[in-house]
UniProtKB/Swiss-Prot annotation:
Pfam families: Pribosyl_synth, Pribosyltran_N. It comes from Lactiplantibacillus plantarum (strain ATCC BAA-793 / NCIMB 8826 / WCFS1) (Lactobacillus plantarum). It is found in: Cytoplasm. D-ribose 5-phosphate binds at residues 201, 225, 229-233. One of its GO terms (molecular function) is ribose phosphate diphosphokinase activity. Binds 2 Mg(2+) ions per subunit. One of its GO terms (biological process) is purine nucleotide biosynthetic process. Keywords: ATP-binding, Cytoplasm, Kinase, Magnesium, Metal-binding, Nucleotide biosynthesis, Nucleotide-binding, Transferase. SMART domains: Pribosyltran_N. The keyword Coiled coil does not apply. ATP binds at residues 43-45, 102-103. Its EC number is 2.7.6.1. This is Ribose-phosphate pyrophosphokinase 1. It catalyses: D-ribose 5-phosphate + ATP = 5-phospho-alpha-D-ribose 1-diphosphate + AMP + H(+).
Amino acid sequence: MSEQYFDPKLKIFALNSNKPLAEKIADAVGVKLGKTSVDRFSDGEIRINIEESIRGDQVYIIQSTSAPVNDNLMELLIMIDALRRASAKTINVVIPYYGYARQDRKARSREPITAKLVANMLETAGATRILALDLHAAQIQGFFDIPLDHLMGAPLLADYFLNHHLDENAVVVSPDHGGVTRARKLAEFLKAPIAIIDKRRPRANVAEVMNIIGDVKGKRAIMIDDMIDTAGTITLGAQALVDAGATEVYASCTHPVLSGPAIERIEKSPIKKLVVTDSIELPAAKRIDKIEQVSVGQLMGQAIKFIHENKPVSPLFKNRFHNEEN
């Protein structure tokens, strides 16, 4: 554990979605995780008990709303309510992976905006601040009427490629037009050019690669996205890059959702290595040799300390992507 933190009024609790990451975050802060129990009634209802006093404390709850999304979201809402009723001074919700983020707008008639609904529920339950990591859509920050600090996983992914000298003769590739800003920032850090894969998606979770904008021939292609779900986009893109003359293909993302046929597709693809963070806990079956995880524990732990001490989080991104105080 890091040096013990001096303020006894800072408490960190973890729910069930990603306890290994929660331990790393608490260790980075220098505190032990608070005592709480999460059980189920016989009919499946969630029961939470906070096993220590938090009256007047500044509390941080760590919970990714990853699969099973609805269970993890409900756990979080119930925990927030319990903390509010137990007189916590502040309730800071740390969400390494924000579920329902892809439903951030009405793409068709009569569709909900579920990302906004989740924001409403978190606020209504009693959250006073959100600490999020690589939200799928930037506008989700505006769905909240409480403070939200938004961290980025890209600097950690960039560190991996730099430390392994993979930035040499590299081109950073966005798998679609929507990810160009993310790719450009990574490219600036790696001092590499960018390329874009132009694709069409005929239906949900199915992607068709059309063409590549930019020069990838004879280069090491590094693809970056915020999340990989069924891996259709990333694997089709990798094959398109090889067909266009890339010497090798690496892929990276912050959130390894990896549902359905994702692992099989990655195994069969020309991707040499997929670099992801631990925002979502990977079960043993998904920890294949091609996947490398880097931890966001230190990053999020430092953010918690800065927030608790009323300091800007911008030093976490010094000389990288964020240069202004937040």
